[in-house]
C-alpha cells in the first residue's frame, strides 16, 4: 500500500485557532478561510499551482490586526508540510521557478533540506494591498520556512505593481515547491542527501 503524503496540524494559542491539512499528491483543491481575504487568495495560488490539496481554517484576533493570524497560518502550513514530507525519502529536494505576472517577474529557489533559511528580496511599493499589510508577506514565508525546514530564496527581477509582485511570488513558490517535493523515480527509496538524512522541522 502506497504511503500517503499528508500533514494535518491544529494550532491553538490565546491569539489564534488554526487548522491546516495538506496533501502533497493532490489535484489543487483548496478551502481557505483565514479571515484575511488576501491571504486566502494567496493560499489558493499555492494550492492551484503546486497541485497540493490544502484546507486552512483560522480564527484569530484580526480585530486588532492580521499579524498573529498571518504568522500562525504560516507556522501551521510549515508544520503540516514537514509532517507530509516525513523523512523526505525519494523527493527531488530542490526546486526552482520563474513566474511572470504582467510586468512582475519573480524567481524562487527552494531546498527541502531541513535547514530553515529565508533570503527575501522583494521591493513591494505599497504598504497595503486591500486591507492586507504587505510587510506580512515576509512574515508568512519566514514562518513557513522555519517550521517546514526549507531553505528559500525569493528574488524580484521586475515589477512595480504590489498585487502582481506578491501573487507572482506565491505562484513561483508553489511551482518550485511542487518540483522539490515530487518523488524522483531514480531514487524513490533514498534520502536525497550524501549524509543519508535530512532534518524534520516542525515536529
Swiss-Prot record:
Any one Gene Ontology cellular component term annotated for this protein: cytoplasm
UniProt keyword annotations, A-Z: Amino-acid biosynthesis, Cytoplasm, Histidine biosynthesis, Lyase
Enzyme class at the top of the EC tree: lyase
Top-rank taxon, per record: Bacteria
Keyword DNA repair attributed: no
Intracellular or extracellular location(s): Cytoplasm
Pathway assigned to this chain's UniProt record: Amino-acid biosynthesis; L-histidine biosynthesis; L-histidine from 5-phospho-alpha-D-ribose 1-diphosphate: step 6/9
Location of region: Disordered: 184-203
Catalysed reactions, semicolon-separated: D-erythro-1-(imidazol-4-yl)glycerol 3-phosphate = 3-(imidazol-4-yl)-2-oxopropyl phosphate + H2O
Family statement: Belongs to the imidazoleglycerol-phosphate dehydratase family.
One Pfam family hit: IGPD
Single biological process term from Gene Ontology: L-histidine biosynthetic process
GO molecular function: imidazoleglycerol-phosphate dehydratase activity
InterPro entries: IGPD_sf (IPR038494), ImidazoleglycerolP_deHydtase (IPR000807), ImidazoleglycerP_deHydtase_CS (IPR020565), Ribosomal_Su5_D2-typ_SF (IPR020568)
Predominant location: cytoplasm
EC number: 4.2.1.19
Gene3D superfamilies, per the entry: Imidazole glycerol phosphate dehydratase, domain 1
Record protein name field: Imidazoleglycerol-phosphate dehydratase
Coiled-coil segments on the chain, per record: none
Protein's organism: Prochlorococcus marinus (strain NATL2A)
Record's keyword annotation contains Lyase: yes
Amino acid at each position: 500500500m502506497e504511503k500517503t503524503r499528508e500533514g494535518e496540524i491544529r494550532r491553538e494559542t490565546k491569539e489564534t485557532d488554526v487548522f491546516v491539512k495538506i496533501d502533497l499528491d493532490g489535484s489543487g483543491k483548496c478551502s481557505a478561510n483565514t479571515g484575511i481575504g488576501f491571504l486566502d487568495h494567496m493560499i489558493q495560488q499555492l494550492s492551484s499551482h503546486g497541485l497540493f490539496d490544502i484546507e486552512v481554517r483560522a480564527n484569530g484576533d484580526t480585530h486588532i490586526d492580521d499579524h498573529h493570524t498571518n504568522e500562525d497560518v504560516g507556522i501551521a502550513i510549515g508544520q503540516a508540510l514537514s509532517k507530509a514530507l516525513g523523512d523526505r525519502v525519494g523527493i527531488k529536494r530542490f526546486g526552482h521557478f520563474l513566474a511572470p505576472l504582467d510586468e512582475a517577474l519573480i524567481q524562487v529557489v527552494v531546498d527541502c533540506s531541513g535547514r530553515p533559511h529565508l533570503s527575501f528580496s522583494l521591493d513591494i511599493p505599497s504598504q497595503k494591498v486591500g486591507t492586507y499589510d504587505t510587510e506580512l508577506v515576509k512574515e508568512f514565508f519566514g514562518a513557513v520556512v522555519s517550521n517546514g525546514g526549507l531553505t528559500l530564496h525569493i528574488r524580484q527581477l521586475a515589477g512595480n505593481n504590489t498585487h502582481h509582485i506578491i501573487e507572482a511570488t506565491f505562484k513561483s513558490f508553489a511551482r518550485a515547491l511542487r518540483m522539490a517535493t515530487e518523488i524522483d523515480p531514480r531514487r524513490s527509496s533514498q534520502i536525497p542527501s550524501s549524509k543519508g538524512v535530512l532534518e524534520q522541522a516542525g515536529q
